[in-house]
């Protein structure tokens, strides 16, 4: 029973737990690390930050931008198709599809309905839109979707 008493027990501690710690040496080891970290942060602060621009668009915005680009491209191609002696002024396009808000799709739809009429001769004018020779809205939509498919899936 004598072995169970705490007076008789001696614990043996590992050497790293019993060795006296030199506080000066421990501080000198930590100090250079802190200086390196601080120097690294100063170096980061002196360099110009790298700016990356990320554009995020949903599918509807991508289609709007693509259609706007196609419409602009078609407007640029049509003056070359028209005879040089009869230049037709293109209708003003107030908003760029790149800067317009998603809520302004009515302007894009209006301009989309105008571009097929640009190829008509001056004698036809806007009244020709109601004639049986004009394209149906389904054909116009299919034509626009054809360009979108061509851009995104080829």
From Swiss-Prot:
InterPro entries: MRI
Any one Gene Ontology BP term: negative regulation of double-strand break repair via nonhomologous end joining
Region Disordered: start-end pairs: 77-144
Key words, A-Z: Acetylation, Chromosome, Cytoplasm, DNA damage, DNA repair, Nucleus
A cellular-component GO term for this protein: cytoplasm
Low complexity composition bias: residue spans: 95-105
Modification N-acetylmethionine, positions: 1
Subcellular location: Cytoplasm; Nucleus; Chromosome
Pfam families: MRI
Chain positions of motif KBM: 1-21
Positions occupied by motif XLM: 144-154
Record keyword Mitochondrion present: no
Purpose: Cell-cycle-specific regulator of classical non-homologous end joining (NHEJ) of DNA double-strand break (DSB) repair, which can act both as an activator or inhibitor of NHEJ, depending on the cell cycle phase. Acts as a regulator of DNA repair pathway choice by specifically inhibiting classical NHEJ during the S and G2 phases, thereby promoting error-free repair by homologous recombination during cell cycle phases when sister chromatids are present.
Domain notes: The KBM (Ku-binding motif) mediates interaction with XRCC5/Ku80 and XRCC6/Ku70 and recruitment to DNA damage sites.
Quaternary organization: Interacts (via KBM motif) with XRCC5/Ku80 and XRCC6/Ku70 heterodimer. Interacts (via XLF motif) with TRIM28/KAP1, ATM, MRE11, NBN and RAD50. Interacts with splicing factor SF3B1. Interacts with ERCC6L2; this interaction is DNA independent.
The name this protein goes by in its record: Cell cycle regulator of non-homologous end joining
Taxonomic source organism: Cricetulus griseus (Chinese hamster)
